Amino acid sequence: MARAKLPRSPSEGKAGPGDTPAGAAAPEEPHGLSPLLPARGGGSVGSDVGQRVQVEFYVNENTFKERLKLFFIKNQRSSLRIRLFNFSLKLLTCLLYIVRVLLDNPDQGIGCWGCTKYNYTFNGSSSEFHWAPILWVERKMALWVIQVIVATISFLETMLIIYLSYKGNIWEQIFHVSFVLEMINTLPFIITVFWPPLRNLFIPVFLNCWLAKHALENMINDFHRAILRTQSAMFNQVLILFCTLLCLVFTGTCGIQHLERAGGNLNLLTSFYFCIVTFSTVGFGDVTPKIWPSQLLVVILICVTLVVLPLQFEELVYLWMERQKSGGNYSRHRARTEKHVVLCVSSLKIDLLMDFLNEFYAHPRLQDYYVVILCPSEMDVQVRRVLQIPLWSQRVIYLQGSALKDQDLMRAKMDNGEACFILSSRNEVDRTAADHQTILRAWAVKDFAPNCPLYVQILKPENKFHVKFADHVVCEEECKYAMLALNCICPATSTLITLLVHTSRGQEGQESPEQWQRTYGRCSGNEVYHIRMGDSKFFREYEGKSFTYAAFHAHKKYGVCLIGLKREENKSILLNPGPRHILAASDTCFYINITKEENSAFIFKQEEKQKRRGLAGQALYEGPSRLPVHSIIASMGTVAMDLQNTDCRPSQGGSGGDGTKLTLPTENGSGSRRPSIAPVLELADSSALLPCDLLSDQSEDEVTPSDDEGLSVVEYVKGYPPNSPYIGSSPTLCHLLPVKAPFCCLRLDKGCKHNSYEDAKAYGFKNKLIIVSAETAGNGLYNFIVPLRAYYRSRRELNPIVLLLDNKPDHHFLEAICCFPMVYYMEGSVDNLDSLLQCGIIYADNLVVVDKESTMSAEEDYMADAKTIVNVQTMFRLFPSLSITTELTHPSNMRFMQFRAKDSYSLALSKLEKQERENGSNLAFMFRLPFAAGRVFSISMLDTLLYQSFVKDYMITITRLLLGLDTTPGSGYLCAMKVTEDDLWIRTYGRLFQKLCSSSAEIPIGIYRTECHVFSEPHDVRAQSQISVNMEDCEDTREAKGPWGTRAASGSGSTHGRHGGSADPVEHPLLRRKSLQWARKLSRKSTKQAGKAPVATDWITQQRLSLYRRSERQELSELVKNRMKHLGLPTTGYEDVANLTASDVMNRVNLGYLQDEMNDHHQNTLSYVLINPPPDTRLEPNDIVYLIRSDPLAHVASSSQSRKSSCSNKLSSCNPETRDETQL
């Protein structure tokens, strides 16, 4: 606060340096000195004290008028009391008027006070009447005294308020309606005190009802101000409307009753009846006014009603519509008695809303929760339509408001909420701005309700550290890039994670005639659950045993997959901590199963029967989801996993459990080189543990790197990346270059002074490329590189990474990636064939197309993916053998990936998707072939990860561990292993589980299966829209069906998958011959149907022609070769043809000159993911098994020797693709 500078006193000005100041004689400070006026710097202390002046503030409020104004008007609570008193006074006057009417008797005579009374009678046949009954009434003395006192008080209060609220215009206040009514109802009573004959004068005191209405409105406003309630307009308007109706009826009743004293002499009840009948427009006519004054009053009342009420109703309807838009309030009473969560979003779309509601209410214990949506924008038509459905209208409340306003947070009762979900708007053009809004919302909620759990979704990883205080945070770009990276080495990781984080009962596809759809849908119901080991029926018998032992036997006995645990004293979750980890009763176990153990029932009747027969019992599990019984007895002479033919011996050092170990016999037969499956030990045996998968005894020479390759391998070192592109990235041990690569060497297509390479072939990579197409090199792209360069990946199997960027990366990003080996970038786009060829697409195994930020929003809904879909379709037809993973903005657009207009199988899947959506499935899109195969992904599918964390607070941590975003010491990592024909002696998934647990302590969690299908176009309307023929079906083999309908493939049989063999069906004469045989059989069946033979014949002809049509594919190959030569790329062995421009090639593809869609290799196979399949699931060639491999650095000192010897026995790499060394 500014203060005036005090002038020097004359004595101070004359005093010299050595003089004593005049103020020294008064050293005491004056009482009440303002602390805002410190002592001046000049002179002595005594002089400063003498010059100080006491300043008193707000002296204007000390006047009598201001004090009265503060009490009557300004102060909320005191003014509320005054208005309440005034309201009570007006009601009292109305009550006294009614008492006066009831006590009045016109038959006793009418006249002034103290005068002679006369009786007046009304002649109904005449229109004349007397005014005396209207002017004079009978008023008792006591009643008159009370009315005079009340009128005097009201008059004085009115005069005081007029004085206090005077603003310079007295006439405006005098002619105000309320002042006029006050004078009419109070001043006559005061006059009667001085003029007694007027004491019986009629005074319309009933008009005080309007003053009472006005006082009530002011009182409610003050009350709302006192309790800080601002959202009360709707309540006020309803109250005003009700009071207006009441005042109109009361005024009409009293007015007609009084005027009819000179006419029909009606009582109050009859007058009230007449008013109600008249205002309701019924008008029976049994009671009517007799004289013209009362008739005139009725007309005036009707006119006033016709004017006032429509205005009131209009205001009420307007406020009602505004309230419908804003959503009203969530009452404090409901917030205290009910449970609710708040969803904060920038804009609410129907897809986001349904994903949230379906996932949130999929959990049984959340059925009684309410969802309060706080959104600043108006509710759109689709959302409004959904929220009107009874299923959601009773549980979802939409409030229009901002999370930055405390008033809106109060409306949502955020401080009473069970949780607050804050979601970013991913479809914004400026995603950084969207993150900033999310951060502010999170801060506002934390400030307003610090105890409310926060679940925050952030887009950019560099913004994540701003919301680290939140209970759960999901960074979209971190998860997206890590998942797309794992898709390249563990196929369909995106599908695996998506299915795990969606709540499902595994009932999808169970009505389908296709076996793979039933199995795939059943396994999709597996989720991650947790339970304390001491409370678990699944795991408590394994206390004191190794983690691997418990995982294998729990899967064998109950069909559950134990994937990790958490120590009671440690907050870190460990995935597959390895066989050296001994389970304790206090451990929290995390497992994959159809449903949680608490909802499972255990049936042991069959086990008791087997025990009576002398056989080793097998526990059966039959949960509420009807999980089939797991039969784990192997057949056909192979080594059995049960205890039927094994020797039992006491366990060594094991406590609890069954006290036995498996001692499995060796395989019979001469010339067999397959080892038997060793038992899983209760306690770890360091000498027997190998850190890699040992499904076959490959020779050491097969995996020993050559000398040339060994030189390149030695160049890499293990360490932590020195430069993180953003704050908050988890440190991960990676393969690094000993010396950072210069920025110029990171450019793939341009040589520099360090090397002259200008294309991918010149580098001579040993492994095939992984190409990532992105618009910009954002910080999230760093998380694509880290999982592919993690220390636990084999150095021999590191794939070169090429970043195909639309815009040049900045130096900050290059500084972060220059330490990684074989990471390059190139400027270009996926819609440019030259760019694709220059970055080495013909030498690549995987192409990842990342959704572009600039195209995430479109004027028309769901059109944001149009460009991406068309570009990927072009590449799909140009390079059919390339594995392309595409990110889309909208999951519903995945049906356009690898689109084939005449594919009846896709049409059948579309019908199945609609059926599942009608059944209320959260995974209706799961049967789309691109999604099942892991070739398409949308980050919105991972929104459920944040929602599911409300019930499972560990899901985000487990997902980040699986994706390699976080590394916890002692925790395992996700990898994959390919099953070849040489490994089919294992036969079943359960035996594979035992093999992996006993040899390398790896935990399998699922299978990625690829099957060969011949897609047809049936013409029987009663038949399904697809006919699938497996290779085994073509060979007319009869295979045993398991409980889940899985095929029992023979060891010599092969299933044509997309990971093996050529993409050209010409090279498979057996497939072609069998397909034609199948077509002829189908043709013979079709001829039995009358009227359909010509159609079937045309269709068979078309199929035959499509099997032999290869000219278009050859033409496309020539076009691509020609573009390579034009760009100066190596084309050894290609014929010289005339050059064509890149646009010519693209146009010829898009115009449909290539007609051989039905023969492409990708289109003859389908792939899908089986999460935690039953133990008796048969393995098939080209199956890829998802593994959680234990941390290689967990026990380096004790296992370094065994790891050195294990390298020669590794079956195959974690990379699911063929890892043959190829010199490009």
From Swiss-Prot:
Residues 113-139, 195-201, 261-267, 289-290 are extracellular. Pfam families: BK_channel_a, Ion_trans_2, Slo-like_RCK. Residues 13-27, 1045-1055, 1198-1215 have a biased composition (Low complexity). Na(+) 1 binds at L499, H502, S524, N526. It comes from Mus musculus (Mouse). The gene is Kcnt1. Residues 338-474, 767-907 form the RCK N-terminal domain. Disruption phenotype: Kcnt2-null mice exhibit impaired action potential firing in sensory neurons and increased mechanical hypersensitivity in neuropathic pain models. Deficient mice display impaired motor skill learning. Kcnt2-null mice exhibit severely impaired synaptic function in the hippocampus of infant and milder deficits in adult Kcnt2-deficient mice. This is Potassium channel subfamily T member 1.
